């Protein structure tokens, strides 16, 4: 007789202290990059590091461009505005970025295509006047 075990994976959410520690390290990595890889003036940068978006939530005004920047050494990530019906970005390798300009007020969740289910790599952009 054999018994089969069922395993279900749920996203793992980092606690606030862990997220802060990860995001502090992400910021140090970002500052070490050549300036050509930084967000452009007027853009908001969201860093991708250790399966975390840093910061995980941002609030911007309509017309603001958010630029996601991979500051990992080896891992690729993507940005997927799935609930908005947008296609997933291509995989972003270290020092690569992708951007999106938000024009309408609202709350816009996004995720990393390869890492949202197992690693809980999700974030939210809130657009408010």
Question: What are the residue ranges of the model-derived segments?
Answer:
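Bacterial N-terminal signal peptides
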Residues: 1-7
């Amino acid at each position: 007789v054999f018994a089969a075990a069922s395993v279900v994976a749920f996203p793992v959410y980092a606690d606030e202290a862990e997220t802060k520690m990860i995001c502090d390290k992400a910021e140090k990595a970002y500052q070490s990059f050549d300036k050509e890889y930084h967000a452009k003036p007027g853009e908001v940068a969201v860093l991708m590091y250790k399966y975390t978006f840093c910061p995980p939530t941002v609030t911007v005004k309509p017309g603001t461009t958010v630029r996601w920047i991979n500051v990992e050494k080896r891992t690729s990530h993507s940005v997927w505005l799935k609930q908005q019906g947008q296609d997933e970005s291509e995989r972003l390798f270290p020092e690569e970025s992708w951007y999106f300009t938000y024009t309408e007020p609202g709350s816009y969740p996004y995720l990393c295509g390869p890492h949202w289910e197992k690693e809980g790599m999700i974030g939210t952009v809130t657009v408010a006047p």
